[in-house]
């Protein structure tokens, strides 16, 4: 499976996680549907985002306003950050696509004082209790440090942000590569 992806064909023992792929994807019906509707998909692309969010909301039985359809992570991050108001707390080092979308005066940064940049939910709660923000953004596991907060820690952080009326944004793009 892994030999089909990445650019490390000279190093077959190396696994390349640069591309987000799903080896368990059920291809049986979706490929057939795409083939059947290919002429429509090509001639009528792109569908209105309203149509896409409505279809997704019906599929997952959630409110339509909870769905933001997009063409990849970069577009979704851009839309998300443009809609945020107030200040945002980030943890650095981090994936800079998020904070780079805002002026510096709106971004408040936590940097772990530990040599390996490790931190946990208690470190974040302690810091952001003294540096109030409107939104807390957590990438978990973090890119590039690889720091990971367990599900129990995430729940504690989510409860704390709810209690403090802080919007909590959790990006778990690479959570499939973690344990716990």
Could you describe each region identified by the protein language model?
Residues 22, 41-162, 169, 174-180:
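Conserved core of the PLP fold type I
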Residues 1-44, 131-132:
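N-terminal "arm"/small-domain region of PLP-dependent enzymes with the aminotransferase-like
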Residues 17, 168-169:
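Residue-level marker for buried hydrophobic side chains located in beta-strands
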């Amino acid at each position: 499976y892994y030999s089909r992806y990445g650019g490390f064909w000279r190093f077959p023992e190396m696994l390349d996680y640069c591309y987000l792929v799903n080896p368990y994807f059920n291809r049986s019906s979706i490929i057939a549907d795409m083939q059947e509707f290919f002429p429509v998909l090509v001639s009528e692309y792109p569908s209105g985002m309203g149509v896409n969010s409505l279809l997704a909301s019906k599929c997952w039985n959630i409110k339509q306003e909870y769905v933001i359809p997009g063409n990849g992570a970069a577009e979704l991050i851009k839309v998300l950050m443009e809609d945020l108001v107030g200040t945002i707390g980030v943890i650095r080092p981090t994936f800079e696509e998020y904070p780079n979308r805002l002026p510096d005066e709106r971004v408040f940064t936590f940097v772990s004082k530990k040599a390996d940049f490790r931190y946990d939910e208690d470190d974040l709660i302690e810091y952001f209790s003294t540096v109030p923000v409107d939104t807390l953004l957590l990438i978990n596991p973090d890119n590039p440090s690889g720091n990971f907060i367990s599900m129990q820690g995430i729940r504690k952080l989510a409860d704390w942000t709810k209690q403090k009326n802080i919007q909590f944004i959790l990006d778990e793009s690479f959570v499939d590569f973690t344990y716990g």
